[in-house]
């Protein structure tokens, strides 16, 4: 295990090597949280099993961390409801669910298929235009929240955690910032 001096610093970066087939499994475990010198906000949008749920709950309860923003969950769709209630923001694994993300994923898939079959791809993948492409805001934070307010998704999940898969499967299309014109 390698622990650079950055652990607990402003960056809160930790290198850690684990043996075995699943090298990222529970990288953020009890030892990880105990090693933090500051109280960071933990954000997980990568893979649910990267963070050990019980260790994260313990870190939240003992104030080793300031807060948690979780989009991917250990054991989803059967997520830990205690953890969900304690998160600042908890969403149903939808971080990549923007229309732009789906268009990019489709483009990458088509590129790979064309490369594999050695054919020239002649296609254009565009995300649909936003319903209201012009945003009027006082500042950038307000503009971003008009484009997408994650607390709305969080509230839906916290109100009906048993609908995790439905909330994820029926997720409405949203656009990324580049699709909008912001007027301050």
Where are these regions (language model features)?
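Residues that recognize and position ribonucleotide moieties
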Residues: 4, 26, 49
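Rossmann-like dinucleotide-binding domain for NAD(H)/NADP(H)
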Residues: 39-184
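Short glycine-/small-residue-rich Rossmann-like dinucleotide-binding loops
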Residues: 14-19, 46-47
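NAD(P)-binding Rossmann-fold cofactor-contacting core
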Residues: 9, 17, 75
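Structural alpha-helical scaffold elements that stabilize or flank donor/cofactor-binding regions
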Residues: 5, 32-35, 82-83
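Glycine-rich, flexible loop/turn motifs
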Residues: 2, 23-24, 79, 90
